[in-house]
Amino acid sequence: DFEGKPLVNEDGTPRVPTYPNTMKQNFLSSFPSHENFSLFQLEDTEYFNAFGGGVPIYLNGKKEIMNCYDFVHFDGPHTTEKVLEEAMFFAPRSRVGTRFVFDDHDTYEMSKIAYVLIHFGFRTTEMGKTKCMLEKVE
């Protein structure tokens, strides 16, 4: 998990990794002037099931359903299969200008994920040591 502990309990049952509050605070400190975003700390399937039809947003006393994402930060789990599953959820819910940032891309096959996302109009725009950014250009 994020703290280096095995993902299996002593009795052999799988253990769900935690997202410690310190990681959340570190993430949020990188966006001091961006107040208009929501950070959901949910497991993938929990998020997909809850918000597959959109996220309810309340603005000026009105409820709107947001089902198009402008920015998605992928930070774990770090397997090609799971990251691709996440990307495939968000790709059809994106628009031109949407940016996907993948953390720790060297721990999975980022080239395969980028190749699949080409078919959704994404192109790799920046590649760093630990992060990779793709942007939807068409």
Language-model-detected regions and their locations in the chain:
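S-adenosylmethionine/decaboxylated-SAM
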Residues: 1-138
